[in-house]
């Protein structure tokens, strides 16, 4: 049984060997079969050709001009997806799940999203949060719940911190007073009967 599975998977393929002749090979035969390669001479070093400045004025501006040195090219290249423009926060209040792909695209464009789901059905809102959270996870972004059905989703270039400490947090309305617990049916003092034992 095991062999039939191995045969089916191709592990018991009959090995085919090339036929070879045993015998002494003298050195003349070896050199006849494998002639020695002649080493190729190295090209003689020549002086490098002088650099020529481009004739396009916009490209020429990328070259540094200095009277004491030869022209050199400015090799600084900007990172794709990173710009010097200010960060953008998009506030979205979707009415249906069909609007979620646009929110994911905004995250991919490195924009932060404040997602207010108060206008959606609760089941559809949960599905929307799960979808956007998955997209945020896929781009190594961050998510934070900032209110009732309000979420913040940011790309990985934005760090979200809560700068308020517990002492600085504004006082929230006090919870309704709970009724006092009834007095226990037994007292904390030991009864004379318990002391006798």
UniProtKB/Swiss-Prot annotation:
UniProt entry tagged with the keyword Transcription? no
What ranges does the record list as Polar residues composition bias? 58-72
Q: Which GO terms describe its biological process?
A: division septum assembly; FtsZ-dependent cytokinesis
Determine if Cytoplasm is one of this entry's keywords: yes
- Family annotation (InterPro entries): Cell_div_SepF, Cell_div_SepF/SepF-rel, SepF-like_sf
For this UniProt record, the keywords arranged alphabetically read as follows: Cell cycle, Cell division, Cytoplasm, Septation
Q: Where in the cell is it found?
A: Cytoplasm
Mark out the compositionally biased spans (Low complexity).
Answer: 170-185
Return the GO cellular component terms, semicolon-separated.
Answer: cytoplasm
Region Disordered: what ranges?
38-72, 164-197
Q: Which domain of life is it from?
A: Bacteria
Functional description taken from the UniProt entry: Cell division protein that is part of the divisome complex and is recruited early to the Z-ring. Probably stimulates Z-ring formation, perhaps through the cross-linking of FtsZ protofilaments. Its function overlaps with FtsA.
Of which family is this protein a member? Answer: Belongs to the SepF family.
Q: Which PANTHER family match?
A: CELL DIVISION PROTEIN SEPF (PTHR35798:SF1)
Q: How does it assemble?
A: Homodimer. Interacts with FtsZ.
> What name goes with this protein?
Cell division protein SepF
């Amino acid at each position: 049984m095991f062999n039939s599975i191995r045969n089916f998977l191709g592990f018991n393929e009959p090995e085919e060997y090339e036929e070879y002749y045993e015998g002494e090979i003298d050195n003349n035969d070896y050199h006849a079969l494998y002639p020695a390669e002649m080493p190729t001479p190295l090209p003689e070093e020549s002086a490098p050709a002088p650099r020529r400045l481009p004739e396009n004025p916009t490209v020429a501006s990328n070259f540094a001009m200095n009277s004491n040195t030869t022209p050199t090219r400015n090799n600084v290249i900007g990172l794709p997806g990173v710009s010097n423009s200010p960060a953008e926060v998009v506030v979205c209040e979707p009415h249906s799940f069909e609007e979620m792909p646009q929110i994911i695209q905004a995250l991919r464009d490195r924009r932060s999203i404040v997602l207010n789901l108060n206008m959606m059905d609760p089941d559809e809102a949960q599905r929307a949060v799960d979808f956007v959270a998955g997209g945020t996870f896929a781009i190594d972004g961050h998510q934070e719940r900032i209110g009732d059905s309000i979420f913040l989703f940011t790309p990985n270039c934005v760090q979200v911190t809560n700068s308020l400490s517990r002492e600085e947090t504004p006082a929230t309305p006090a919870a309704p007073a709970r009724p006092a617990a009834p007095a226990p049916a037994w007292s904390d003092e030991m009864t004379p009967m318990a002391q006798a034992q």
